[in-house]
Structures are given as C-alpha cells and as structure tokens.
Regions:
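FAD-binding FR-type
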Residues: 1-45, 58, 97, 107-108, ...
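Surface-exposed acidic, glycine-flexible loop patches that form ligand/cofactor-binding
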Residues: 34-36, 65-66, 129-133
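Hydrophobic/small residue at the entry helix of a nucleotide-binding pocket
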Residues: 50-55, 148
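Histidine-anchored nucleotide/phosphate-binding helix
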Residues: 54-66
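Reductase modules of NAD(P)H-dependent flavoproteins
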Residues: 70-170
Length: 170
C-alpha cells in the first residue's frame, strides 16, 4: 500500500476499505474476535508491510500490561531494511521482554549487509519462527493479500491451524 501512496499526486483521492475483522486484546490472554471472547497463551503474529501497525497495538498492549503472561512471536515480512516500520520499538520490546517476545524479520530484497532472514515468507520460515498449532496457541495475520493468501494461510492450514478456531486475519 505504501508504494501506491508514494505515487499519488497532491489532490488525488483514494478510497479505503477496512478493517474486515475485529480483534481486540482484553488482557491476560483474553481476546475478543468478532464479538466472541477467546483465550490464548501463545500468540503468533504474521505481519507484512504496513500490517505491522495493528499488530504493534496488540504487542504493546500485551507487553505493557503488568503481570500479563501471553508469549508473542512475530514474523514481519518486508522488502528491505528501510521498509521495516516501528523497527526500533519492536527491537526494544525484543530486548526488554526477551522471555515473552521474539521477532523475526524476513526481507525479499535486503541489502548485502543484512544478516537476517532473506527471501519471501514461506512454510519453513513459519515453522521455525511461529508457535506450533496447539491448544492455547493462535496465529493472527495482517499484511498484503498475496502474502496472506499464497504463503501464510496455506502453510498454517497445512501445519494444523484452523480458520475461526486459532487462525484469524485482521
């Protein structure tokens, strides 16, 4: 989306639709998903591009709530280092909440200096950096439709995650 917005000229208009689903964090592992309360101990967030922004709200709420216990793993997919939004805030969380929070960035077009994951989001990246599909675990997705539809959803479903039980998009 940011690539499209960069190309707009002053005065041009954009129609925006969203959000399609509602996920709210209520505290202490409790989530409200489309008006139903659910409880999860381990949260995987698979985010891409500007999708990190709503994901960040959930992360911050969990990590900044005293005595909140859910563990969070994030896979953040971008093109390059310059495209990673909220980079310093996420790295601060990783440093200050290392027992509760982990983040893996995967870049499709990194610089030669990049030492992290390279390529596109795929099943191997997901299985290495996400919580396995078990009771009390959830995967939440927000990112470009192609990444979600072609990579994240098939890999998570094949692994054992189920739509509307422990697999949700927002």
């Amino acid at each position: 989306m940011s690539n499209i917005l960069d190309c707009l000229r002053e005065g041009e208009e954009v129609e925006v639709k969203g959000p399609s689903g509602e996920i709210r964090y209520l505290g202490h592992g409790r989530f409200e998903v489309d008006d139903n309360e659910r409880r999860f101990d381990n949260v995987t967030l698979i985010l891409g591009g500007s999708g990190v922004t709503p994901g960040y709200q959930i992360i911050a709420r969990i990590l900044n709530t005293p005595d909140d216990k859910p563990r969070v793993k994030v896979i953040d997919a971008n093109k390059s280092e310059n495209d990673i939004l909220l980079s310093s805030e996420l790295e601060d969380f990783a440093r200050n909440h290392c027992e509760q929070f982990q983040i893996a960035h995967v870049l499709s077009h990194p610089s030669d200096k990049w030492k992290g994951l390279k390529g596109h989001l795929n099943e191997d990246v997901i299985k290495e950096h996400a919580f396995e599909p078990a009771e009390g675990n959830v995967a939440l997705l927000c990112g470009p439709p192609t990444m979600i539809q072609k990579a994240a959803l098939p890999a998570l479903r094949d692994w054992g995650y189920d739509d509307d039980r422990n697999l949700f998009g927002f």
